Amino acid sequence: MSGNESVVNYDHFIDKRRVRKAFERAAPLYDQAAVLQREVCDRMLSRLEYIKYMPDVVLDAGSGTGYGTCKLLERYPDASMLAIDIATGMHHQARQRMNSMIPRWRQLFGVGRNQRTSRVRYVAGDIEQLPLEDSCAGLVWSNLALQWCNDLKKTFDEMRRILKNGGLFMFSTFGPDTLKELRQAFRHADDYSHVNRFADMHDIGDMLVHSGFATPVMDMEYITLTYDEVISVMRDLKAIGAHNATGARHRGLTGKNAWQKAIGHYETLRTGGKLPATFEVVYGHAWKPAPRTSILTPETRRHIGLE
């Protein structure tokens, strides 16, 4: 796929209503299973150490339960924060997290409550269609949320729209090898899609350029989690709301025979008594360039026929 194309494969089309419901259900216990999300967030934060830039407004796009939001507030103590998520239940958990960071005696007497919480505005919405005005943020931060977008090019256009000139877009998402073991296991079981599809790092970089971003920097790494049983992999995915929401998914329950075939194939991958679950994590950042200004005077432009 070329970077300037915007094509949606409806077999891989993500049902946003299903995604929202999954995250609403997952919100209360999300943090118990979101080990990978926190780890990737911390690795993104370490990358920020090398970028000397102080935004006045930060957008956490796909803010979840607020782990990254709190970290960004600490890093940018003078910035205000916009936290957008598709599930309002995630915002409820984020507010609880924020309040838990205030000492109990301060909560009882109302001292210091507004010093942190008043800097955060929670917004319910889809990051593919941001309900925000143009040029409102200096930094757009998105940790493991872009994989839920149907049209990445459109999403990048939105990120550029709401960024201020000279602003930074920093993100992580999943690459094609994510959950490759699970995908291969079910490929031996039936013809349905059981794992969402993920964009290639190089395609993502191309789309950033075609969306008007400057100097994109991309890299990736593999992170492998290990489990005792296949069912534990599925439970963790369910606990973080990571259901398969594509159009090609099975609309009913996976049959017993298909399930047993999938388990049997997955078991052949057991190493050292553990089953692997691989995640290809793609990192990227790019800048919204300032508009180009002509060095030609109006008189010169008229003289050479440009006006």
Swiss-Prot record:
Entry's family note: Belongs to the methyltransferase superfamily.
Protein source organism: Nitrosospira multiformis (strain ATCC 25196 / NCIMB 11849 / C 71)
Enzyme class: transferase
Gene: bioC
Record's keyword annotation contains Protease: no
Pathway annotation from the record: Cofactor biosynthesis; biotin biosynthesis
Keyword Protein transport: no
UniProt keywords, alphabetically: Biotin biosynthesis, Methyltransferase, S-adenosyl-L-methionine, Transferase
Pfam families in alphabetical order: Methyltransf_11
Molecular function terms, GO-annotated: carboxyl-O-methyltransferase activity; malonyl-CoA methyltransferase activity; S-adenosylmethionine-dependent methyltransferase activity
Biological role: Converts the free carboxyl group of a malonyl-thioester to its methyl ester by transfer of a methyl group from S-adenosyl-L-methionine (SAM). It allows to synthesize pimeloyl-ACP via the fatty acid synthetic pathway.
The protein's name: Malonyl-[acyl-carrier protein] O-methyltransferase
Stored InterPro entries: BioC, Malonyl-ACP_OMT, Methyltransf_11, SAM-dependent_MTases_sf
Catalytic activity from the UniProt record: malonyl-[ACP] + S-adenosyl-L-methionine = malonyl-[ACP] methyl ester + S-adenosyl-L-homocysteine
GO biological process assignments: biotin biosynthetic process; methylation
EC number: 2.1.1.197
Organism superkingdom: Bacteria
